Swiss-Prot record:
This is ATP synthase subunit alpha. Its EC number is 7.1.2.2. The record marks 373 as: Required for activity. The keyword Membrane applies. Transmembrane segments: none annotated. Pfam families: ATP-synt_ab, ATP-synt_ab_C, ATP-synt_ab_N. One of its GO terms (cellular component) is plasma membrane. GO terms for molecular function: ADP binding; ATP binding; proton-transporting ATP synthase activity, rotational mechanism. The gene is atpA. It is a peripheral membrane protein. The keyword Protein biosynthesis does not apply. InterPro entries: ATP_synth_asu-like_sf (IPR023366), ATP_synth_asu_C (IPR000793), ATP_synth_asu_C_sf (IPR038376), ATP_synth_F1_a_nt-bd_dom (IPR033732), ATP_synth_F1_asu (IPR005294), ATPase_a/bsu_AS (IPR020003), ATPase_F1/V1/A1_a/bsu_N (IPR004100), ATPase_F1/V1/A1_a/bsu_N_sf (IPR036121).
Length: 550
């Protein structure tokens, strides 16, 4: 029988090999507990290493974002259904800061405030994630606004032009056409998109905050019908969403846009509207027990909007030359632009377009108040032909409004004042525009030139709309080269002479047709018994149509 021997060296070697190959699978996890919850807010105790804006996960899988970092607890805004969150539940850190997925696949899609698709068209492949709380480009990364962003709206492109990288506020009471102005601007980018030229193309983002779901659906329908959805992303946070989603939606849209801007592309983003975002932020702040300030808004409500709108910029050539143009919308009460939120946003932006209820009700649409609307930086980006023809337009309209108010009390006016009133009424009529019908820049230049130079003074006010549409049609058929020259930025004596000749020829046709309609109609038959004493005449007057007299 063999003798059993124990080798201590072998045992020691085996133990050393085992110890050296051993790795402890230990994971460290911070866990907190819900102290109280309600109204979409949870206060969590524990989790001492939590970062601001870090995502936290509750027991049922619901996500929340840490906004308040107090000594004893964390104030968390729940992003989702908070009905299942109860006191005592466990909460754990994710280590991820609030961010949104980005990429070209978002064009043509509708997403929520977290960048998740809600249009039923499946998942969206992303090119990465971008934090919602990103710093705006610094001073050295920017350059002056020098490229125009055409809205297709005559009154805006002529008097308050917008440049790529500008922040232009659209402000007014409810139901004054604010959203329509923004949508017209999106629709007007269609030809640029279809040109295929990256320098011309503008990607659009429409952020809907606190609107009815049916309204958002109708806006999507308008964009689809016009063929504009292919270059547009809708970030929707309807009225039914919790306040946290409404507060975050504009930042999500901005993050998607910044991804394209830093890629050297041009972006247009519409925030519709920031009044509702401020109200949602107020609700969240009060529930988090932050001290209220003016109108119960928290002290940092200015920073809420400034850090959002400062992301809109025109980047320098070294940074790729991309841009993000912002059109924030603010709703006023009784045309009061001196309220807290309107004055905040006016001071942040580069100009404002003020829409007035009285003008809207008078049929002046878009209802732009020329006196209070201004563009501080867009003038340097305005196309040269428009800059040359629209110089006196704002002054003419301002003088017209002043004279109009005076004429209401004055019984008689001198000839010059009457002429100014006549021209002003035609300019107002000329700047009217139907919904969702943006004008190409060359058409705008021709019409503004005709109005400012008095070429429409002998056209009846009621016929201005028909005259402009028929005249543009006439130019496209007979003088297409002139329109092409204007579109290319050419404006000089030769172009003016061609337009002079064209409008003179067309007015003969137009006014001749008017005379034919009015003068060559059969005389009215006299009533029975009045054959011997009634005379019916027909005549034409340049300014007005007078009734038949006896």
């Amino acid at each position: 029988m063999a003798e059993l021997t124990i080798s201590t060296e072998e045992i020691r070697g085996a133990l050393e090999r085992y110890v050296s190959s051993y790795s402890a699978d230990v994971s460290r996890e911070e866990v907190g507990t819900v102290a109280d919850a309600g109204d979409g807010i949870a206060h969590v105790e524990g989790l001492p290493s939590t970062m601001t804006n870090e995502l936290l996960e509750f027991e049922d899988g619901t996500i929340g974002v840490a906004l308040n970092l107090d000594v004893r607890e964390i104030g968390v805004v729940v992003l989702g259904d908070f009905a299942g969150i109860e006191e005592g539940q466990r909460v754990k850190r994710t280590g991820r800061v609030l961010s949104a997925p980005v990429g070209d696949a978002f064009l043509g899609r509708v997403v929520n405030a977290l960048g998740e698709p809600i249009d039923g068209l499946g998942d969206i492949p992303n090119e990465g994630f971008r934090e919602l709380e990103l710093q705006a480009p610094n001073v050295m990364s920017r350059k002056s606004v020098d490229e125009p962003l055409q809205t297709g709206i005559k009154a805006i492109d002529a008097m308050t032009p917008i440049g790529r990288g500008q922040r232009q506020l659209i402000i007014g009471d409810r139901k004054t056409g604010k959203t329509t102005v923004a949508l017209d601007t999106i629709l007007n980018q269609r030809d640029n998109w279809r040109s295929g030229d990256p320098k011309k193309q503008v990607r659009c983002i429409y952020v809907a905050v606190g609107q009815k779901a049916s309204t958002i659906a109708s806006i999507k329908g308008v964009l689809e019908e016009a063929g504009a959805m292919e270059y547009t992303t809708i970030v929707a946070s309807p009225a039914s969403d919790p306040a946290g989603f409404k507060y975050l939606a504009p930042y999500t849209g901005s993050s998607i846009g910044q991804h394209w801007m830093y890629g050297g592309k041009h972006v247009l983003i519409v925030f519709d509207d920031l009044s509702k975002q401020a109200e949602a932020y107020r609700a969240v702040s009060l529930l988090l027990r932050r001290p209220p300030g003016r109108e119960a808004y928290p002290g940092d409500v200015f920073y809420l909007h400034s850090r959002l709108l400062e992301r809109c910029a025109k980047l320098s050539d070294e940074m790729g030359g991309g841009s993000m143009t912002g059109l924030p919308i603010i709703e006023t009460k009784a045309n009061d632009i001196s309220a807290f939120i309107p004055t905040n946003v006016i001071s942040i932006t580069d100009g404002q377009i003020f829409l007035e209820t009285d003008l809207f009700n008078q049929g002046v649409r878009p209802a732009i108040n020329v006196g209070t609307s201004v563009s501080r930086v867009g003038g340097s980006a305005q196309v040269k032909p428009m800059k040359k023809v629209s110089g006196s337009l704002r002054l003419n309209l301002a003088q017209y409004r002043e004279l109009e108010a005076f004429a209401a009390f004055a019984s008689d006016l001198d000839k010059a004042s009457r002429a100014q009133l006549e021209r002003g009424s035609r300019l107002v009529e000329l700047l009217k525009q139907p919904n969702y019908t943006p004008f190409p820049v060359q058409d705008q230049v021709v019409l503004v030139w005709a109005g400012v130079e008095g070429k429409l003074d002998d056209i009846p006010v009621g016929e201005i709309g028909r005259f402009e549409s028929e005249f543009l049609q006439y130019l496209r058929h007979k003088h297409e080269g002139v329109l092409a020259q204007i579109a290319g930025g050419t404006w000089g004596d030769e172009v003016i002479a061609s337009l002079d000749a064209a409008i003179s020829d067309f007015k003969k046709l137009f006014l001749g047709k008017e005379d034919e309609l009015r003068i060559n109609e059969p005389a009215a038959e006299p009533l029975a018994g009045e054959e011997d004493r009634e005379t019916v005449t027909r005549f034409h007057d340049d300014a007005t149509d007078r009734p038949a007299g006896s």
